[in-house]
C-alpha cells in the first residue's frame, strides 16, 4: 500500500506540476562527467537510474554530440565500469567488471561507432579502475589504481584467504577511517602497457606497483581519493601521484607530497615538495592535490595548502620543473580563493582552474607564469562546475556541472565568449520537470562580523502573495557551504516542494567567500556561526513576508547536526516547531572518538588532553543547556559513521526521551555519515519530511505532503510511558 500511495502521489504531482517528490529525486537519471574524444566531436558519459519497482539501478554509457547536444546510447551493459578514449579516433578502452579471472576485471577495446564489435585485450587480477593512457612508441602505457597487498601485489578479495580469527590488532593510527576499519591493504597506483599486435592491442596482465616501494605511502588517498590523485605524462614515461607524507602521523597531520616515478618503476618514487625540502617554498607543509603534467611533460602543476593540520586551508597553485632541482614556483598566491582542480591549455601557456566563489563552483583562467597578485578571469557558464575537459586542441572546454535546479548541465565554455548549452537535465527528464533558476535567489544579511550569504529556494508554483513555513537548513563541514549545486542527499528543492521556503545559510566557517570567513570558525563553533544564524532568522522574520517563521523548522547534518543540537539549548531553539539533527556531535569530550584527529586538533586549537577546555566550551550536553530543551527533535545516526560514533545520536535521544520531549531516533545499520542507498534514502525522506510536516502544520495545509505514516517501516516502541510520567 505504501508503494502504491507513493506512486499515485508522484504521478499526481508530476501531472499537475505541483511538486518534486523524494521518489522523483531518487529515481531521476544520474549522469557522470562527459569526456570528449580527441577530435572534439563526441563525449562519453555514464548514466544510471534507480527503479523502485525492480529495486535495482541499471546503468550504461551514452554519447553526447558536441555540435548539437544530441544523446545516443553507447551500451546498456551495467558491467562496463569505465570507458576512456584510446587516443586514436573514436576507439575506446573500457573496463568490464565481469571476467574469467575470479575477482578480476577485463580490459576491452572497441570503437564508439561500433561498440558491439569489441575485443578483449587482457585481464587484471583484481579490482582496478581510474585508467589514464598515453602513447609510448608502438605501445600504450597506462596507469590505474587498486588495492595493494603488503607485498605489493594487486589485492584480489575473491582470492584472499579467509582469516582464522576476526581480530584486528593496531600499533598506530588510523584504527578506522570514515566508514571502514583500516586493514593491511592500501590503495596504490599500478602501471602497465598495451602492446600492439597487428591492428589489435593486448595486455599481458603484468602490473607494476609504483607506490608500495615507498613505505607507508598510499595513493589515491582514502576515503575520497580517485584518479585526480595521479597523472601520466603525455609521452607515457613519468607518473605523478599524491600521498600523505609517509614519515608523518597521518591521523594528526594533513601534510602530503607529490611524488614522481618512472612508468616502468625502475626507480623508487621521490617527492618534489617534501616538507622543508630544497625545492619546497618556505613554510608550505599542508595537503597537496591535483597533480597534472604540462602537455610537453616538462612541468607539473599541483595545488597545496600551507598549514600542516588544516584540511580547509587555502590551496595555492604550484608549478615544478620535472627533472630539475629548481625551486617550486607559486602562482597567483595572493588570490583569495581555494582552487580545487587545475589543467594546462594545449599550448602550455594557460592554466584553467576550478574554485568555489560566492557559493558557486566557477571556472577560471590565468597565465601559467602569473605573478602573485594576479587575479584569475572567470569563464562564463551556468551552475557549478564538477569537471571539465578540453575539446581537441582548442581553448574551449566541455563542462560537466549541476546546480540547485538541475542535476546535470553539459555545456561548452570558451574564455571571453558566452557559454553554449548542450544538455540540461531539467529540460529533458520528467522527474525534474518544472525545476529552473526562477525559484532560486541569493540573500545577503549583516552577520556577526560581516555580510553573510544564504540561498532562498522556493517551491514549485510559488506565489509571493502566500505564506510558506521556513525550512532553515544548516550545512556541514563546518568548512563547507550551500553551493549552487545539486545534492543527492540533502536537496533543498525536495524540502521546498513539501510546501516550505528554504533558507540555506553560509555562516562563519563557510568556504568560497574568502579564507578569513572560513578560518574564523576555529575554536568558535557555537559563537559567530550561531550569531550569524540568529541574524539571518531575524532578517527573514522581519523582512520577508512570504516566509512564516512562527511555524518554521531547522535541520542540519554533521556540523549542521551539531548546530541543531546547540540551537536546542539556546533561545533560537524556541523559535522552531521542530528540529532534525543528522550525525551531529552531542557531548563535547566525545570528539576524541573521531577518525581524523587533525580536524579536531585544528578546530579546537590543540589536542584533547592539552586544550580540553576548548572541546568543552561548545558542549551541547551541558546541564544548563539541556535544561532549556523543549522543541520536538528527530535524531538520525548510522552505525558506519566513524566520523562520530552512533553513540552520540543514541545519547542525544536518551536525554530527549528522559526529558519527555517528543522525539524519534532513526538509525541505518548499513549506512555511514551519509545515507546513499536508494531505499534507505526514501525512508530517510519519509521520516525527515514526515517529522517536520507534522510539527509545522504542513500536513494540514498540504494534503499531498509526506506523512510519517507513509513510511512502511514499523516503529519500535517498548515503553508505555515516559520516565517522567512516574
From Swiss-Prot:
Catalytic residues in the record: 558 (charge relay system), 641 (charge relay system), 673 (charge relay system)
Alphabetical list of Pfam families matching this protein: PD40, Peptidase_S9
Enzyme's top EC category: hydrolase
Location of region: Disordered: 269-291
Gene Ontology CC annotations of this record: extracellular region
Glycosylation sites: 96, 252, 605, 699
GO MF annotations in UniProt: serine-type endopeptidase activity
Biological processes annotated in GO: proteolysis
First-listed, main subcellular location of the protein, grouped into a coarse class: secreted
E.C. code: 3.4.14.-
Keywords of the record: Allergen, Glycoprotein, Hydrolase, Protease, Secreted, Serine protease, Signal
Top-level taxon of origin: Eukaryota
PANTHER family (alphabetical): DIPEPTIDYL-PEPTIDASE 5-RELATED, SERINE PEPTIDASE S9 FAMILY MEMBER
Family: Belongs to the peptidase S9C family.
Name assigned to this protein: Dipeptidyl-peptidase 5
